Amino acid sequence: MKLAAIFLASSVLLSLLPIHLSQGEAAGERRQWCPSKQQVFRGSCSDDGGQKCLNDLLWTWNPSVRLSPIYCDCTPKRHNKRLCDCPSMICL
């Protein structure tokens, strides 16, 4: 009976793993920022452009990036775009 319970629990966990790994990737939202550590986003930099870039980074990249100290620079681009540069991000 214990073996059946362990097998069932393992099956459930393994079936959830692909769902966890693909969250956000189906729509192409999660991006690898490494090695350039730069990404272009829509919108303007405004006064808090660096923080806006950091928020976008956390939204579109792996949550484990929060474990490292990060600062970002925001550079305005044409057509309501901005370049986010986060040189202190640790690439794993």
Swiss-Prot record:
GO terms for biological process: defense response to fungus; killing of cells of another organism; signal transduction. InterPro entries: SCRL. The keyword Signal applies. Keywords: Antimicrobial, Disulfide bond, Fungicide, Plant defense, Secreted, Signal. GO terms for cellular component: extracellular region. Residues 1-24 form the signal peptide. Disulfide bonds join C34-C91, C45-C74, C53-C84, C72-C86. It holds the Pfam family SCRL. This is Defensin-like protein 249. It comes from Arabidopsis thaliana (Mouse-ear cress). The gene is SCRL7.
